Amino acid sequence: MGATGEQGFSSNDWERPVHQVTLSGNYIGQTEVTQELWLAVMGSNPSYYTSDSQLPVERVSWSNCQDFIEQLNQLTGKTFRLPTEAEWEFAARGGNMSQRYRYAGSNNVHDVAWFWSSIPSQQSGTPGYGTQPVATLAPNELGLYDMSGNVWEWCQDYSSDDQTNPTGPSWGTYRIFRGGSWSRSSECCRVAYRNYTYPSTSDDTMGFRLAL
């Protein structure tokens, strides 16, 4: 994990040092959770951009995601959860098939990410502004879509040391989110880029994907 050579310069020092983690097998969602799925589970849609059911759900806090996951698990009998940060970055990098790309699936950010300058229009209220339907750009090496861009993705926790199956501290003030969003620059779409905020934060750039 961390800012390996292909990531280039970053002012975000906490992407370093590069360190090794060991993960057990897990599953991660091919796409961000869509508004269609959220509505089916929760019965309402908190999102700001609602023109297409295949848009990622947004305006969801980390705590909202936990409520959704609890309800989904009751309905399905599964044990879905948010990915840990280590799981998220491993998947974004392409797992064991990684080609060491700067972004999730390419060194050309326009191939794989919806971000500020790639949105068809940057004027609020006009077509193309905001989130875009999932899986409309190229996937990464694992067949995962939008690991770079579209909406930020909440992680369960964070980690900083070499360890096996890191889940980060058991308590703290902030939660990690990764991947960049439609409202930010390509720099934020790098697979090593990290960010954090309060778990109560929600806006039209914040979404998530599931792990199992």
Could you describe each region identified by the protein language model?
Residues S202-L212:
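Short, structured beta-strand segments at or near domain termini in extracellular proteins/domains
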Residues M1-P46, S148-G149:
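A short glycine-rich, aromatic-capped structural motif
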